[in-house]
Design a protein with these regions (language model features):
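Charged regulatory segments coupled to nucleotide-binding catalytic modules in large multidomain enzymes
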Residues: 249-385
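P-loop NTPase nucleotide-binding/switch module
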Residues: 1-12
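Interdomain "switch/hinge" adjacent to the Bergerat
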Residues: 1-3, 38-94, 119-288, 294-295, ...
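Conserved ATP-binding N-box helix of the HATPase_c
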Residues: 17-53, 100-106
């Protein structure tokens, strides 16, 4: 039988992500999948389902907890101890590879999973010595994955109330080089566009977006996610701003999102690949990101962001074109499968067709929108002279 070397574990933890904040996305994603299952099983109503993130900077402590299904005691060790052996389904669940839960091992001294399943009187806990794992990974000794997991993992059960149902991730003693993970505002700003949360109530065009989604029989998955008790929302604004005073970050509106427009992308068989909305403005100029965190077109699958606000810039005739827009592109086809870093889709026939159509629309429609707006303004300026 083949030996699985320790480098695999390194690739799935310390070598997996360039941005440490991704751990929040991974744990929120897992929580949302379990919320879907809890609602389906009748354990909880969707309105009551929540993901609670707690950040204690002074204690260098982070926890991510949901009130979804939890894990049965009988399934706990196999479900949490196995690597890349998830029973989640591609195209149904937001996460499906069974590797995301390990990401916290790279950023703390101790990682703890604790859970309880409704109807059981015992909770289960799994503790990972993350510091020891990293020491073993950097050692010249050729440890196997089994060697390392056997040395760093311990489990136990504890009494719990029969009606309790939850899953909790705790990251204890966050590494000093990862102090950004303890910045509550930074984390909230990151998750407000990455996580599957609702649009902020003040965004005037959200009803139009929901209506278009409903016309396609598409449900935008939204969940209650809180950071230290503060609910998260997608921070889309009705106006576009400049910063007039960099020191005090004073903002002044220079344009507005007057409406939103839509585009549906279908494959050669007439099946919906994806759809998008984008804000219509006067396209005065490239939107300054410092004053407008929602700038750029963002790709989403399961309402979780793929890549960042620059991911689709390469499909514009000129990359700066992306910075004239705000909007979202929702992947629909099950053939659009996020890669393990969730910064793009796997290479499939559907991805090729999606990108081909995206590029054509950006070239034929979006480029002309902002280019003609600019040409019209320049013409007007010349005539005033």
């Amino acid at each position: 039988m083949a030996t699985i070397g320790k480098n695999i574990l390194e690739n799935l933890t310390t070598g997996m992500y360039a941005d440490s904040k991704v751990i929040y996305r991974e744990y929120v994603q897992n929580a949302c999948d379990q919320i879907d299952k809890a609602v389906e099983l009748g354990i909880i109503d969707r309105e009551q389902a929540e993901v609670f993130i707690s950040i204690k900077e002074d204690e260098r402590f982070i926890s991510v907890e949901d009130n979804a299904t939890g894990v049965k005691e009988a399934d706990f060790v196999a479900q949490l101890g196995d690597i890349a052996n998830s029973d989640k389904k591609v195209g149904v669940d937001k996460g499906f590879r069974g590797i995301g839960r390990l990401c916290g091992l790279a950023y703390c001294k101790t990682l703890v999973f604790s859970t309880s399943y409704k109807g059981e009187t015992k909770g289960s806990k799994m503790v990972f010595d993350a510091k020891k794992m990293r020491e073993m990974l950097s050692s010249p000794v050729k440890y196997t994955v089994d060697d390392i997991m056997g040395a760093i993992v311990s489990t136990e059960t504890f009494p719990e109330e029969q009606e309790k149902h939850y899953f909790k991730v705790e990251m204890i003693d966050i590494n000093h080089e990862n102090t950004d993970l303890l910045d509550k505002q930074l984390v909230s700003d990151y998750l407000s566009f990455v996580a599957p949360v609702p649009y902020v109530n003040s965004f005037h065009h959200r009803d139009a977006i929901y209506e278009h989604a409903a016309s396609l029989h598409f449900k935008i998955d939204e969940y209650n996610v809180e950071v230290n008790g503060n609910p998260l929302f997608k921070k889309y604004q009705n106006r576009l701003y400049d910063i007039t005073n960099a020191t005090n970050k004073v903002k002044k509106a220079y344009d507005e999102i007057s409406s939103v427009a839509f585009k549906d992308f279908v494959d050669s068989n007439g099946q919906l690949l994806a759809w998008m909305w984008y804000g219509v403005s006067r396209f005065e100029k490239a939107i300054p990101k410092a004053a407008n965190p929602m700038c750029g077109l963002r790709v989403r699958q399961g309402n979780i962001q793929i890549g960042d606000n620059t991911t689709v810039a390469k499909f514009f005739k000129e990359e700066r074109g992306n910075s004239y827009f705000v909007g979202e592109i929702f992947a629909v086809s099950k053939g659009l499968i996020p890669n393990s870093q969730r910064d793009n889709f796997n290479e499939t026939v559907e991805r090729v067709e999606f990108e081909t159509q995206l590029k054509k629309f950006f070239y034929d429609t979006l480029h002309k929108l902002y280019y003609m707006a600019s040409a019209t303004r320049n013409y007007g300026k010349r005539n005033k002279k």
